[in-house]
UniProtKB/Swiss-Prot annotation:
CTPSs have evolved a hybrid strategy for distinguishing between UTP and CTP. The overlapping regions of the product feedback inhibitory and substrate sites recognize a common feature in both compounds, the triphosphate moiety. To differentiate isosteric substrate and product pyrimidine rings, an additional pocket far from the expected kinase/ligase catalytic site, specifically recognizes the cytosine and ribose portions of the product inhibitor. Allosterically activated by GTP, when glutamine is the substrate; GTP has no effect on the reaction when ammonia is the substrate. The allosteric effector GTP functions by stabilizing the protein conformation that binds the tetrahedral intermediate(s) formed during glutamine hydrolysis. Inhibited by the product CTP, via allosteric rather than competitive inhibition. CTP binds at S13, D146, I147, E148, K186, T187, K188, P189, T190, Q191, K222. One of its GO terms (cellular component) is cytosol. Mg(2+) binds at D71, E139. L-glutamine binds at G351, L379, G380, M381, Q382, E402, R469. It comes from Stutzerimonas stutzeri (strain A1501). The gene is pyrG. It is an enzyme of class 6 (ligase). This is CTP synthase. The active site is at C378 (nucleophile), H514, E516. One of its GO terms (biological process) is 'de novo' CTP biosynthetic process. Catalyzes the ATP-dependent amination of UTP to CTP with either L-glutamine or ammonia as the source of nitrogen. Regulates intracellular CTP levels through interactions with the four ribonucleotide triphosphates.
Length: 543
């Protein structure tokens, strides 16, 4: 029977509930338990797919094609369990399903209310998402006291009662600030946060106290006294120089032992040797490279969370310190490609819309002409094709129909038909809704033997995740290939271009898929490892 650990946050947001939850999950997994994780988002959007990256950050795409919260990326990077569409849902999704049933008449004329109809749907989704896991960690977005979170917290209260105390526990993250002028940490915000929780019928079993430093024993004892939590369950979680230290920090304080004892689970001790290796490689690199990342959402780096982590993972695998130089593509437009001087490689990630695209195209040209290692992802591949068409073929009006519907040479256009992650045929037009209408999820791709991308993966068939609605125009491919553009990866059915490479270049690879979604700190990802190795080779030749 599944045990549930519900995770809430108090005092302020951005305490790191996702990292703390994933770290505990990693320890429990290291003890041989089957673990899964869920994220409940209180906002009213159906999913984050159409939300601004500046507001929400990255949209993480699961293997089965769900557009989800970026915390699911943390979950997959910390545990081996693959997330699905059942591991993340929002208030909007819950209300959408309940209202659809009401319209069908499923409720037989009953008055639809938050309690019991909305809370019942939340509980149903939690149980479904947990599946047959030994332990399911369920993170609630936002902070206690937010009006949006109330239905979720009420559903948790009910579910704890229904499954019993031996199958459910509540872990609450809270802020314990250090006041420099007083020279001490303050526990009062934590006390008030727990008081708020208890007022809605929830007593925390574990308190994870976030601070910029370790919390002393006397403060932990005081927190335990005033919050009715066992002293051993008051955990100090200070800032760390890498998030991959967190499993070790929690384990050292016995959090996993407390959870296992509380649930009455029989399992082995935790083997965190893999995480020790990751931390050692991260903190003790032997080499160093500087890579320019040219994007259009640089004001909020969370928009590229998985990509930044994937570059870190590639560094871990080769014991290389990867210094990312974040450059806004609009700055390239305004100040020129001189901003790229001195880097060992260039990375252009995905994005949507016209803003900053010309800066990305100029970046591609700089990388191609100066023989600097280049990796383009999604839009980064599309601008690579546009640049090649303009500067090699001489099609000055070459563009994507996303940016110029009247282009004389639309080398990138809207995909109108494709197979989804389940093999079903999807059809889209310009009139389709924006939400949920892209080519999403895991798709098979065939690689060309002898190509740079094949050298990275070492096999002809791969599976990678996608999130796009525009693709290279097959009608203009013959001219592009005749001019030297290499098509080194195609979709499983051969219909869509997946990878392109530039001729006469030491390492120029651009892919339509998003390899960052499957990179992990323990295993890395072959494409990013190949990219970092190319940067190291380029740097060595410069020396």
């Amino acid at each position: 029977m599944t045990r549930y650990i519900f995770v809430t946050g108090g005092v302020v947001s951005s305490l790191g509930k996702g990292i703390a939850s994933a770290s505990l999950a990693a320890i429990l997994e290291a003890r041989g338990l089957k673990v899964t994780m869920l994220k409940l988002d209180p906002y009213i959007n159906v999913d984050p797919g159409t939300m601004s990256p500046f507001q929400h950050g990255e949209v993480f795409v699961t293997h089965d094609g769900a557009e989800t919260d970026l915390d699911l990326g943390h979950y997959e990077r910390f545990i081996r369990t693959r997330m699905t569409q059942n591991n993340n849902f929002t208030t909007g999704r819950v209300y959408e399903d309940v209202l659809r049933r009401e319209r069908r008449g499923d409720y037989l004329g009953a008055t639809i209310q938050v309690i019991p109809h909305i809370t019942d749907e939340i509980k149903r989704r939690i149980i479904k998402g947990a599946g047959d896991a030994d332990v399911a960690l369920v993170e609630v977005g936002g902070t206690v006291g937010d009006i949006e979170s109330q239905p979720f917290l009420e559903a948790i209260r009910q579910l704890r009662v229904e499954v019993g105390a031996k199958r459910a526990m509540l872990m609450h993250l809270t802020l314990v600030p250090y006041i420099a002028t007083a020279g001490e940490t303050k526990t009062k915000p934590t006390q008030h946060s727990v008081k708020e929780l208890r007022s809605i019928g929830l007593q925390p079993d574990v308190l994870v106290c976030r601070s910029d430093r370790a919390i002393d024993v006397s403060s932990r004892r005081k927190i335990a006294l005033f919050t009715n939590v066992e002293e051993r369950a008051v955990i100090s979680l200070p800032d760390a120089d890498t998030i991959y230290k967190i499993p070790g920090i929690l384990h050292a304080q016995g959090l996993d032992d407390y959870v296992v004892e509380r649930f009455g689970l029989e399992c082995r001790g935790a083997d965190l040797s893999e995480w020790d290796r990751v931390v050692d490689a991260k903190l003790h690199p032997e080499k160093e490279v500087n890579i320019a990342m040219v994007g259009k959402y640089m004001e909020l780096l969370d928009a590229y969370k998985s990509l930044i982590e994937a570059m870190s993972h590639a560094g871990i695998q080769s014991r290389t310190k990867v210094n990312l130089r974040y450059i806004d593509s609009e700055d390239i437009e305004n100040q020129g490609t001189g901003l790229l001087e001195g880097v060992d490689a260039i990375l252009v990630p995905g994005g949507f819309g016209l803003r900053g695209v010309e800066g990305k195209i100029a970046t591609v040209r700089y990388a191609r002409e100066n023989k600097i290692p280049y990796l383009g992802i999604c839009l980064g591949m599309q601008v690579a094709v546009i640049e090649f068409a303009r500067d090699v073929l001489g099609w000055s009006d070459a563009n994507s129909t996303e940016f110029d519907k009247d282009s004389g040479h639309p080398v990138v256009g809207l995909i109108t038909e494709w197979a989804d992650a389940s093999g079903n045929t999807e059809v889209r037009t310009e009139a389709s809704d924006l939400g949920g209408t892209m080519r999403l999820g895991a798709q098979e791709c065939g690689l060309e033997p002898g190509s740079k991308v094949f050298e990275c993966y070492g096999k002809e068939r791969i599976v990678e995740r996608h999130r796009h609605r525009y693709e290279v125009n097959n009608n203009l491919l013959p001219q592009l290939q005749a001019a030297g553009l290499k098509i080194t990866g195609r979709s499983g059915d051969g219909a869509l271009v997946e990878v392109v490479e530039a001729p006469d270049h030491p390492w120029f690879v651009a892919c339509q898929f998003h390899p960052e979604f499957t990179s992990t700190p323990r295993d890395g990802h072959p494409l990013f490892s190949g990219f970092v190795n190319a940067a190291l080779e380029y740097k060595a030749k410069k020396a």
